[in-house]
């Protein structure tokens, strides 16, 4: 099978090539996004492999179909960028990687949490300038505080497992409670309760039409003053404009974002010599109590190996006509 891989970085290529030694697919790597204009580059390929910011809308899928593509392989868990109804109508099979390394994402979320709490990012900059003052670096002891986790799939449960080690009270919201979470002593509550009682809130849920801007002005108003929020899931779970206002009035004490709702034209690229045109992003990133990372929570050697293995195994199952447990349509 010939496979066109879009949005490729060197780390993608390295691990896909290593894992492909066991599969023998013909891999063609492209460093640009899949769009309606670039879909023609998949000509002659039976499958395409895409990531979070590639375009899987109906026009793109129709173009891929014209060029003989049969399979769409997402090398990520989220699939909100793919029109599944259109794929089904066109007879295209879509597969994903539902769980690759939950601990990798959870550990990154914890890293953001600790960095924000103890102002490590600010201390790093100060000490580089020989400024060893501790003024303005006071954090809080996490032991005994309340953590609210929204979404208790594998990543959410991994997060809860770590937070339990901090000695925190654990609250969670998910329409489908997890037995693994309950075993950790997690208390499932409704969103208003989670918002009002949590000192720290961490998002670990997929993006759906129902939870778009889940954290909006109304949600922020229900939260404790000075709440910490960390998002390693999907950017559009947070209303960025409302977050700015909540930061200004100190409702949000600190905000960690590994994802951003308009990240498509920013993340995964070197923009250090560019003038960022996104004014909302610029306002957020200018805040000393906001920490951005560029959608890197998944980026460990173990996770990249797992993603590559599952992606190619999914395609192998489809090629052989076997049942694929990760098939969406």
Curated annotation (Swiss-Prot):
The active site is at residues 234, 263, 295. InterPro entries: D-isomer_2_OHA_DH_cat_dom, D-isomer_DH_CS, D-isomer_DH_CS1, D-isomer_DH_NAD-bd, NAD(P)-bd_dom_sf. NAD(+) binds at residues 154-155, 174, 205-206, 211, 232-234, 258. It is an enzyme of class 1 (oxidoreductase). One of its GO terms (cellular component) is cytosol. GO terms for biological process: lactate metabolic process; mixed acid fermentation; protein homotetramerization; response to heat. One of its GO terms (molecular function) is D-lactate dehydrogenase activity. The keyword rRNA-binding does not apply. The keyword Oxidoreductase applies. PROSITE patterns: D_2_HYDROXYACID_DH_1, D_2_HYDROXYACID_DH_2, D_2_HYDROXYACID_DH_3. Its EC number is 1.1.1.28. It holds the Pfam family 2-Hacid_dh_C. It catalyses: (R)-lactate + NAD(+) = pyruvate + NADH + H(+). It comes from the Bacteria. Keywords: NAD, Oxidoreductase, Stress response. Belongs to the D-isomer specific 2-hydroxyacid dehydrogenase family. Fermentative lactate dehydrogenase. This is D-lactate dehydrogenase. The gene is ldhA.
């Amino acid at each position: 099978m010939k496979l066109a891989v879009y949005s490729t970085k060197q780390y993608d290529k390295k691990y896909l090539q290593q894992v492909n030694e066991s599969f023998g697919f013909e891999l063609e790597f492209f460093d640009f996004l899949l769009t309606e204009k670039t879909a023609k580059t998949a000509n002659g390929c039976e499958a395409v492999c895409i990531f979070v910011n590639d375009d899987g809308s109906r026009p793109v899928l129709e173009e891929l179909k014209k060029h003989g593509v049969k399979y769409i392989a997402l090398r990520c868990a989220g699939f909100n960028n793919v029109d599944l109804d259109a794929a089904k109508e066109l007879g295209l099979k879509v597969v994903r990687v539902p769980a690759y390394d939950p601990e990798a994402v959870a550990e990154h979320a914890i890293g953001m949490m600790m960095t924000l709490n103890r102002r490590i990012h600010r201390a790093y900059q100060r000490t580089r300038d020989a400024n060893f003052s501790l003024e303005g670096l006071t954090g809080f002891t996490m032991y005994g505080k309340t953590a609210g986790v929204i979404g208790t799939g594998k990543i959410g449960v991994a997060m809860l497992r770590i937070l339990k080690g901090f000695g925190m009270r654990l609250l969670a919201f998910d329409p489908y409670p997890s037995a693994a979470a309950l075993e950790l002593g997690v208390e499932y509550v409704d969103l208003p309760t989670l918002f009002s009682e949590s000192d720290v809130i961490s998002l670990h849920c997929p993006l759906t039409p129902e939870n778009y801007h889940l954290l909006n002005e109304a949600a922020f108003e229900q939260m404790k003053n000075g709440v910490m929020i960390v998002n390693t899931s999907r950017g559009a779970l947070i209303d960025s404009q409302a977050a700015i206002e909540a930061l200004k009035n100190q409702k949000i004490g600190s905000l960690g974002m590994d994802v951003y709702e308009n990240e498509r034209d920013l993340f995964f690229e070197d923009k250090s010599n560019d003038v960022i045109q996104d004014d909302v992003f610029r306002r957020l990133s200018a805040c000393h109590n906001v920490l951005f990372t560029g959608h890197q929570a998944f980026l460990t050697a173990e996770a990249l190996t797992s993603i590559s293995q599952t992606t190619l195994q999914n395609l192998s199952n489809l090629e052989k006509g076997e049942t694929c447990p990760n098939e969406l349509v």
